[in-house]
Amino acid sequence: MKNFNKKFILLFILLLFISGSLFAAKSDDDDEDDYDKDTYVESYSLGDQMFFINGGVFIPLFFFDRSGEVFDTNLTLGGTGSLCWQVFLSNHFSVGGELGGMFALSPNKRILYMIPLMAKATYWFRFYPFEIPISIGLGGNLSILEEAAHIDFIAKPSVGFYWNFNEEWAFGANATYWFVPQIYSGSGMVESGHSMFGNFMDVTLSVLFRF
């Protein structure tokens, strides 16, 4: 009986030792997982940079004039693309510049080109491993239709959704509104009554590289 008790006590101690070892190993694994997760989630600081390549579909919406009357754009669906560079000023806020372009066809098959060059500011919301950037771009837009060309102001608010593949690369999509007021003073060849406010949008896929 005494031998049995001794064996039972030794077995109990052995089980406690094994259980403690397993628990410690599990805790170490959990700590490593938490560490990996914490280090994998992007945390940005002043000077961290990003480069974007975007491409997708350009969607004409409508024009309206100074009186508020709405007109069809008479444009087909088109294509658009852009290159963007940004630098972080804080963990959630970045600024930079964007150069883009689009094309679409008029009813008589003339091609409209627009080439916007903008300064851009972005605020980033993060939900690991996803990020949601909300941006505003302001700048100048060169519109070209055959021999006619005009430079106008442009504003482009946008929202995106990105998945972080790793610490350097992310892939996502953006929806962007184009507001292009084409205003004539009447002092030139075009009367002021021909001023129009263009409203368009695009939906693009994006590749993001951090460095």
Range-by-range predicted roles:
Residues 18-20, 26, 81, 134, ...:
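Intrinsically disordered, low-complexity segments enriched in Ser/Pro/Gly/Ala and basic residues
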Residues 55, 136-138, 175-177:
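A structural signal for short, well-ordered beta-strand segments
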Residues 1-47:
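Cleavable N-terminal export/targeting peptides
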Residues 47, 62-72, 107, 155-211:
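Predominantly the C-terminal beta-signal and adjacent terminal strand-loop region
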